[in-house]
A protein has these predicted regions:
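C-terminal cap of thioredoxin/glutaredoxin-like
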Residues: 5-7, 13-30, 106-110, 116-240
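Short, N-terminal intrinsically disordered low-complexity segments that are rich in Pro/Gly
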Residues: 7-10, 14, 45, 66-67
Length: 240
């Protein structure tokens, strides 16, 4: 069973959804037969590098709310993260462009380090408050994932390397009508949108395992719940 996951490294629900999927796979009897592949998706391909404006300030400006209201909104997401053992430091996050991070993740996949790189990039942004567009930071992250500095610099210093791989992933998402992430595709036939509860993922895995081949392409197993996902404009805030 192959699961393809479209996500962005600055999408909080992508990290939460990743953890919930991992929990579901751990509970799944056929877990040894499950392969997970991460796909690139930029929430904002035109995003600038970090300018000093934090996530709470950016959110407040976007929605016309106070900083305190923005903080409370993010606290709700942080609570969901905590439920799966994650710590989100919204006060220190540095929103930025993620294209180079995606290129580096694509390279990591070619040397068998996709899983490690994906986790390190997400943790670096959400928990460690690192600037994941900065090349020095990316070199450091790659080293912790087991990739040599020289290899990383060879990718980062040539903006064409793995750029097409990222664009292909994004084009595939567009063809499927994906407008928000995380977005999960199982065996190129079934889809799950958003950071669904662990039990939803577990049931989906079991259903696909039992019914593989009997369902139409990209059958939606999200249960009608389209919340807990980020679009190219925002991460939805209930009531706004």
């Amino acid at each position: 069973m192959k699961i393809e996951v479209w996500s962005d490294f600055v999408c909080p629900f992508c990290y939460i959804g990743k953890r919930r999927l991992e929990e579901a796979i751990a509970q799944f009897p056929g877990k040894d037969q499950v392969e997970v592949e991460f796909k690139s998706f930029e929430l904002d391909p035109n995003a600038q590098t970090y300018s000093g404006t934090g996530i709470n300030e950016a959110l407040a400006k976007k929605y016309g709310m106070s900083i305190e209201e923005a903080k409370r909104a993010n606290e709700g997401i942080g609570s969901q993260a905590a439920e799966v053992g994650l710590t989100f430091n919204f006060d220190e996050m540095k929103p930025t462009n993620t294209f180079d991070a995606h290129r580096l993740a694509k390279f990591a996949a070619t040397v068998g380090k996709e899983k490690e790189m994906t986790e390190k990039l997400l943790a670096s942004y959400f928990t460690e408050s690192k600037l994941i567009s900065d090349h020095d930071v990316l070199v450091e992250i790659a080293q912790t994932a087991g990739i040599e500095k020289e290899e990383t610099l060879a990718v980062l210093n040539d903006s064409t390397k793995y750029a097409n791989d990222v664009r292909i992933d994004e084009a595939l998402a567009q063809q499927m009508g994906v407008t928000g992430v995380p977005f999960f595709v199982i065996n190129q036939k079934y889809s799950i949108s958003g950071a669904q509860p662990t039990e939803t993922f577990r049931r989906a895995l079991q259903q696909v395992w039992e019914e593989e081949g009997n369902a139409p392409k990209l059958q939606d197993l999200s249960g009608g719940n389209t919340a807990a996902a980020c679009t190219d404009d925002n991460c939805e805030i209930p009531g706004k």
